[in-house]
Each structure stands twice: as C-alpha cells, then as structure tokens.
C-alpha cells in the first residue's frame, strides 16, 4: 500500500507543479512549488504532534489554543520548540489559509505573514539557523505570478487548493519515507528541465547511491557525514541514511539552493539539532574549520574558477601539497579541502571531470603528492558520459582513504560503457550500480572492466591516472576470411550479370532498346 501511495503522491505533486509551469521558468516554479509543499508539511506535522499530545484530554490543537489559557499555550510552544524547532499559531496554519480561500478572500497577505511567522518563531532558539530566511525565495509579489493582484491571488489559491487535496501520508506506518521520496522525485524532475542550472543543486540518485555505498563500506554506523558543495542535500541524505549517520554537515554557496537543502533535511524528518547546513563559499570561507568526518561525499562544480589567492599557501587545507590548484580549475582545491576534513578512519568519494586524472602542471604535482607522499588514492571509477543533467561530459569518482599505509595498489574501474540510454540521457540501472560497488568492495579484477594497479605501475606512468592506461577495453575485431569474402564478391557479380540480362530482355519487349 505504501508503494502505491508513494507513486500516487509523486504524480499528484508533479501535476500541481505544472499548474505554475506556464507562467515561469523551471527553477522559478520549483521554489514556489517546493516551498508550498514544505509549508503544508510543517503545518500538518505540528497539528499531528500537538493533537497526539492532547488526545488523552479529548482536545486538539485548535480547540486548546482557542481556550486562551496562557499557561497551556506556553506549554504547547515549549513542546513544539523542543520537538520540532518551530511553532505555528492556528491562524497561520496551512488549513487556515485554505479556509480563507474558501471564503473567497485575498490570501496573499495572510500567506506572507504565515511564512514569516514560522521563521520568526525560531528566533532566539537553537533552531534559528535552520529556519532563518527559509522562505525568502517565495516572492508573492512576483510579476511571474500574474499581472494583477487578483491574478496572483487566483493562481496561488489554485495551487494551494490542489495541494490541500493531496494526502502526504504522514500517518502511514511504513519503512518508506513517502513524502521525502516524493520531494526527491520532484527535485529530480525539476533538474531534468533546468538544463545547465541542474548541476548546481542535484546529483542523480544513481550516482548518489554509488557514492553512499562506497563511503559506508565496512561501516555499521557513521558518527557524521559531510558534503562541502551540498546542493539540495540529496547526496547527504542518501549517505546519512545508508550509514545511519548521527549528524549531517553541509555547505552550499547558492542562497536559494541552501534554503532548498534545509527544507529537504526537515522534510525527511531530520531533527533540526541533527544537521548543520551553512551558506557560503566552501573554499574561501570554510564553515567547519575544526571538524573531521567519518564520510565525505561531494559533486563539486566541474572545473570552476576560484581565487587561488596567496593566503591559501598558508592554509592547512592546501599548503601540504606545496602548490595550489590553478585559478581556472578548482577541482583539486575541492579535493584537498575534502581530504583535510576526512578523519583517519574515514572514506571520501567525490565526482570529478576526467581532466583531474591526467592534467599536468600544478595539478600533476598535487596528484603525485597524493599518491607518492600520502598514498591516499584508493580507487578511480569511470562513469558513463551524459548521466548528469546539464552536461554531457564523462566523469569519474575519486575514492580517498587516509588509512592505506599497507595498501600498495589503486583500483581502476571503467564503467563508462555500461548504462541504459533513455531519450537524450544515459542512466545507470541497479545492475550497473551493483557491479561498480561490488567490484570496489571486493577489489577484484575483471577483464576489460577493472584493474588493480600497483603503485609502481602508477609511478611508471608518471602518476597519470587516466583509466585507459590501466583498463584495456579495446575489442579486437574478428579476423576476416579473405577467401570467403572473394567468393561472396564473385557470387554477387554473377547475380548482377544475370539481373542485367533479365533487364535487357524486358527492355527489348517494351521496345526501349533494339
């Protein structure tokens, strides 16, 4: 039943999203739709929690609040702040906005107040950083919603009414996170239509699963997990779920995507005290300078520019390599940053463009430092091209471990040819994912797929990690039987001669030739 509800919820939510689609770009209507879903979730969650708390007294949230007992009100507020991290007075609940719509009122002022009240309820509490500015991207005065105030009100009312008719399944007893899964599905659907912008906030679930499976290998429980470029938080959530992580840390540069990540955490039921997502530039302003993590995962922006400022030569994250990543390509700056935050027993896995495997100059020096001096590189996994939204370039996964003192090899996997093509996108199927993860975990050699290269072999290749140097995927063509080909040609020539004769006969009968 829960799987049926899961699929039904996905379809219903995407139908609602398309109500806004004609009025604005994919990214714009994404933030409105996901924001309203989140508002409904917070409202239903608080009503459900308080109603359950008051059930023995034969009361519910709205009745208790209407009694005007100040002591009871304060108790309810305190309970919600401890359990949920926020509070919504009944007049600002989603259901109250729906009542106003049914009364044919202009609900935009009430809706705007409601969203602000949720944020304001956390001021001075431990959850303030998790809720502050959470709805700042929902601009109810946006001309994209309509030309007049009435047009805007009608469109928003239509969306809210449609969402109101959808059961979020919060009361479903299931091992499937029904609403969380639907939210992830929505983000993925928006990413599919967002073109190049998609890479800023979304890592395909198949890639997230590979990264999560790799960094949790051999671990029954993670103390913490970290993503320095966390986007919408999907990769973090997948890894945290895989590794039963106690704490989740992330940093995101884009303020709008940062809001999306925090919503995603809360909507997946991660308690406000169990995650810390910060807004800022990871390389320029590290939000967690003293922290180290059991698992580090990331899908950083490919070959982005960074300042490579002189000050970074004295930054512990980069100084040990003796050289900075080039200004035009921050790939190794992100990799060194992640390694710095990885604890001694942890595992790091990040997505990168293939250029990091073979480019020279400062990047070649950093690569040699990581292999020759530190022996940190555990595996290189080549992925198919065109599996990320917004870019068709082939990518790889770099796996790093600090506890490799006794390992004198690096595993190379070429999974670039194993995928299913769906329209314009390539997709990894479950069997492809399983093969990659199993090969990594067992560190096994498979002809034309994987190779366990010794460090000496890598050194002999001048620390070039380009996968074709280690995994030979060349398919030899079957030998050609020259005699058989010559005979086939002769047979065809004989058939052609016969046909020419037949054509001549027909042409003579028609009087077209003498």
PLM regions: where:
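Non-catalytic, mostly N-terminal accessory regions of nucleic-acid modification and defense proteins
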Residues: 1-215, 273-282, 287, 382-386, ...
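A conserved structural/catalytic subdomain of Rossmann-like adenosyl-cofactor enzymes
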Residues: 4, 286, 290-514
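A generic secondary-structure signal for well-formed alpha-helical elements
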Residues: 40-53, 190, 219, 243, ...
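Short small-residue beta-strand/loop micro-motif enriched in glycine and branched aliphatics
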Residues: 191-194, 246-247, 420-421
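Conserved S-adenosyl-L-methionine
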Residues: 197-298, 303-312, 318-321, 332-333, ...
């Amino acid at each position: 039943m829960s799987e049926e509800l899961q699929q039904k919820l996905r379809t219903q939510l995407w139908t609602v999203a398309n109500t806004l689609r004609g009025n604005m770009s994919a990214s714009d209507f994404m933030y409105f739709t996901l924001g309203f879903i989140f508002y409904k979730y917070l409202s239903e969650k608080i009503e459900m929690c308080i109603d359950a708390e008051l059930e023995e007294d034969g009361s519910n949230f709205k009745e208790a609040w209407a009694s005007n007992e100040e002591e009871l009100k304060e108790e309810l507020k305190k309970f919600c702040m401890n359990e949920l991290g926020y509070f919504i007075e009944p007049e600002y609940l989603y259901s109250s906005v729906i009542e106003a719509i049914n009364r044919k009122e202009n609900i935009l002022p009430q809706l705007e107040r409601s969203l602000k009240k949720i944020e304001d309820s956390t001021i001075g509490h431990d959850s303030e950083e998790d809720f502050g500015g959470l709805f700042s991207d929902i601009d109810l005065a946006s001309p994209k919603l309509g030309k007049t105030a009435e047009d805007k009100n009608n469109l928003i009312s239509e969306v809210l009414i449609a969402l109101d008719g959808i059961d979020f399944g919060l009361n479903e007893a299931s091992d499937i996170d029904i609403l969380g899964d639907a939210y992830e599905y929505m983000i993925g659907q928006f990413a599919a239509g967002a073109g190049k912008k998609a890479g800023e906030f979304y890592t395909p679930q198949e890639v997230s699963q590979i990264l999560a499976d790799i960094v949790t290998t051999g671990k029954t429980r993670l103390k913490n997990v970290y993503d320095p470029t966390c986007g919408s938080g999907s990769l973090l959530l997948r890894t945290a779920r895989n590794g039963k992580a106690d704490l989740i840390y992330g940093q995101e540069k884009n303020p709008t995507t940062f809001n999306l990540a925090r919503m995603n955490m809360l909507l997946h039921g991660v308690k406000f005290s169990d995650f810390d997502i910060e807004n800022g530039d990871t390389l320029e302003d590290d939000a967690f300078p003293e922290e180290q993590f059991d698992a580090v995962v990331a899908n950083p922006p490919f070959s982005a520019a960074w300042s490579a400022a002189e000050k970074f030569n004295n930054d512990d994250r980069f100084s040990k390599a003796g050289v900075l990543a080039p200004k035009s390509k921050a790939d190794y700056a992100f990799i060194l940053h992640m390694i710095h935050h990885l604890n001694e027993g942890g595992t790091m896995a990040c997505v990168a463009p293939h250029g990091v495997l073979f480019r020279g100059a400062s990047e070649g020096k950093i690569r040699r430092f990581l292999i020759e001096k530190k022996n940190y590189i555990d595996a290189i996994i080549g992925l198919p091209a065109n599996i990320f939204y917004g870019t068709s370039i082939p990518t790889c996964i770099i796996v790093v471990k600090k506890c490799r003192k006794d390992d004198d090899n690096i595993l190379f996997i070429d999974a670039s040819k194993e995928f299913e093509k769906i329209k314009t996108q390539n997709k990894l199927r479950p069997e492809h994912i399983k093969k990659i993860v199993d090969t990594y975990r067992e560190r096994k050699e498979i002809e034309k797929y994987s190779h366990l290269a010794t460090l000496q072999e890598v050194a002999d290749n001048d620390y070039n990690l380009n996968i074709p140097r280690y995994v030979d995927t060349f398919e030899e063509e079957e030998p050609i039987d020259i005699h058989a080909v010559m005979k086939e040609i002769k047979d065809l020539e004989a058939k052609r001669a016969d046909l020419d004769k037949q054509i001549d006969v027909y042409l003579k009968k028609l009087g077209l030739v003498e």
